[in-house]
Amino acid sequence: MATTFSASVSTLATSLATPTRISFQKPALVSRTNLSFNLRRSIPTRLSVSCAAKPETIEKVSKIVKKQLSLKDDQKVVAETKFADLGADSLDTVEIVMGLEEEFDIEMAEEKAQKIATVEEAAELIEELVLLKK
């Protein structure tokens, strides 16, 4: 779905008033006497994902997930890893949550625990609960 933004720019030069219609689809430079508008829009070329959780929390959660799912040591588990992609079913997810609660000495509300699908989501929720506990 593409959206085109447009704007009208009016400049008065001596006795002429000329409205100019500019489409923002492509970069443009409009100049009139001493007046210029650079209409170049910066468009991100790459989307990057960043974790709000601390790396050490992500690492602890990853280790617990590996332990609960009996994964091999060389199995890669990172922040974006989904429990379902590791073969976890709903019972496995409950066991993961129980392991996390024990390790971090917290209690997760059932509604929030059911929404956890990735290591990152678990780590972020844990950090939130640890802060609330203090």
Curated annotation (Swiss-Prot):
It comes from the Eukaryota. 4'-phosphopantetheine is transferred from CoA to a specific serine of apo-ACP by acpS. This modification is essential for activity because fatty acids are bound in thioester linkage to the sulfhydryl of the prosthetic group. GO terms for molecular function: acyl carrier activity; phosphopantetheine binding. InterPro entries: ACP, ACP-like_sf, ACP_chloroplastic, PKS_PP-bd, PP-bd_ACP, Ppantetheine_attach_site. Residues 55-130 form the Carrier domain. Pathway: Lipid metabolism; fatty acid biosynthesis. Seed. The keyword Phosphoprotein applies. Pfam families: PP-binding. It is found in: Plastid, Chloroplast. Keywords: Chloroplast, Fatty acid biosynthesis, Fatty acid metabolism, Lipid biosynthesis, Lipid metabolism, Phosphopantetheine, Phosphoprotein, Plastid, Transit peptide. Residues 1-51 form a transit peptide. The modification O-(pantetheine 4'-phosphoryl)serine is found at S90. GO terms for cellular component: chloroplast. Its main location: plastid. The keyword Transcription does not apply. Carrier of the growing fatty acid chain in fatty acid biosynthesis. Belongs to the acyl carrier protein (ACP) family. In rape seeds ACP is coded by two multigene families. There are probably a total of 35 genes. The sequence shown is that of ACL1.A4. This is Acyl carrier protein, chloroplastic. It comes from Brassica napus. The gene is ACL1.A3.
